[in-house]
Amino acid sequence: MSKIIGIDLGTTNSAVAVLEGTESKIIANPEGNRTTPSVVSFKNGEIIVGDAAKRQAVTNPDTVISIKSKMGTSEKVSANGKEYTPQEISAMILQYLKGYAEDYLGEKVTKAVITVPAYFNDAQRQATKDAGKIAGLEVXRIVNEPTAAALAYGLDKTDKEEKXXVFDLGGGTFDVSILELGDGVFDVLSTAGDNKLGGDDFDQKIIDHLVAEFKKENGIDLSTDKMAMQRLKDAAEKAKKDLSGVTSTQISLPFITAGEAGPLHLEMTLTRAKFDDLTRDLVERTKVPVRQALSDAGLSLSEIDEVILVGGSTRIPAVVEAVKAETGKEPNKSVNPDEVVAMGAAIQGGVITGDVKDVVLLDVTPLSLGIETMGGVFTKLIDRNTTIPTSKSQVFSTAADNQPAVDIHVLQGERPMAADNKTLGRFQLTDIPAAPRGIPQIEVTFDIDKNGIVSVKAKDLGTQKEQTIVIQSNSGLTDEEIDRMMKDAEANAEADKKRKEEVDLRNEVDQAIFATEKTIKETEGKGFDAERDAAQAALDDLKKAQEDNNLDDMKAKLEALNEKAQGLAVKLYEQAAAAQQAQEGAEGAQATGNAGDDVVDGEFTEK
């Protein structure tokens, strides 16, 4: 069975890992980095992903960042003169991760385990699965990020029972999960979180502060200048990271804008104390889900054995202090917060392929599921933190006499009224026989699969007629749309491959021309004119093909030049070797002669 890669598709950064033997290994990207920025940019028809895309974000307006925050919505992004769904942009990131994983493994990758925040709703999970499909990946499992982290943390501790709180603060989302680990079973007891809280919000606090201070000093509002704002974002992210290690950092942005008197520069010192003050409300927001998760798990703080930090934003000192204060425990720092989620996903991939034995993952649904009933009430069928996969049925009836159909309004959330919760979908059960209200028996069944994706069935117990839907939110893609996007993604991948081959060929041609010209110059007057003339003719042919920009001709002429240049190089080598041999022979003869000169006659006297 081929490898199933593990992917942490993050808001700010993404990572990919694979199981090698019993060890989960992060795969470095082509630039040698173990995480890849979740950034996509478009330039001259080319799709650029990762570090290269992030580097040009300041100057390229066709750059998309933090697309994960839009997953599960109908919102689209405009770039490259087109509109893209969040699934399509995410697929470009996944395709890039898949590509360099294939280069590392030396084989095609078709399956992946992809992680999502524990608090992702059904629409967001479905969107993630669709993104995988567009990227040419079969998503064998969607795993909650804190659960994946626990898998990576706890794999070597499966013989020891313990309860762990996973505190996961990423670039755009925040989750807390309480798990019980023991005998190879990873049992999620509860999860809570905030899908609108992450490192991006901490960056934004710094940006807002810089904009306000600059306006106060210079009377210019930088928030209306797109390029200045991108530079501020980069500077804010760097300052945030710096302040995890030092107590003060200098923010210097020369030529940030121009005033009446000429160019203006932004120079500011940001202390950790000021940063803590700016972000105090964000840190406070992390405390409520911790309490909620503990309460839902029915545990007290003293029953938690380990607190595991996940996500780059957990490096912020104020966040670490808040975790200590809230849990009364020193967080466990034995795992890399940027890499542990992808590593856990790869372990789950190993569980699926059978490479990892005796490990069972029991995850939960993060939000309650139910339907709207009479009076706009939200009636729950499955409570939050129910272990998945699961199925639950309940019988309802009609609200009016001779009602021919019932509308099933499927919802997810915790509020008592339907209007205050998230609509997952609607469908209708028709052809109900005429009867007084309350008589027809309509059985509604909810199914949640191992990926947390919901399907709902309504059945008239009188006629046995039933209607089933897999939930498609208003952001959901049809099979036709996914197929079209898959074809686009494949076409782009092929175009990117051809473009890379073209660049590699041009580089080879330049290198060959340079090397051959050097060799021809070095061999001047050394007696092998025939080889030099042949190499020069091949060199001229290649230069002509390069001028004509004929790729096929360049390829053929490059091969011809390499052959002629090799012949010339062999002659040069043979001549150098012969000269070396002659020199060694002469030195040997001289040494022998000198040895004779050094002989001294000695007198021997007998005693």
Swiss-Prot record:
Residues 598-607 have a biased composition (Acidic residues). It comes from the Bacteria. Residues 579-607 are annotated as: Disordered. Induction: By stress conditions e.g. heat shock. The modification Phosphothreonine is found at residue 173. The keyword Methyltransferase does not apply. Keywords: ATP-binding, Chaperone, Nucleotide-binding, Phosphoprotein, Stress response. GO terms for molecular function: ATP binding; ATP-dependent protein folding chaperone; unfolded protein binding. The keyword Lipid metabolism does not apply. SUPFAM superfamilies: Actin-like ATPase domain (SSF53067), Heat shock protein 70kD (HSP70), C-terminal subdomain (SSF100934), Heat shock protein 70kD (HSP70), peptide-binding domain (SSF100920). Residues 579-591 have a biased composition (Low complexity). Belongs to the heat shock protein 70 family. Acts as a chaperone. This is Chaperone protein DnaK. It comes from Streptococcus pneumoniae serotype 19F (strain G54). The lineage of its organism: Bacteria, Bacillati, Bacillota, Bacilli, Lactobacillales.
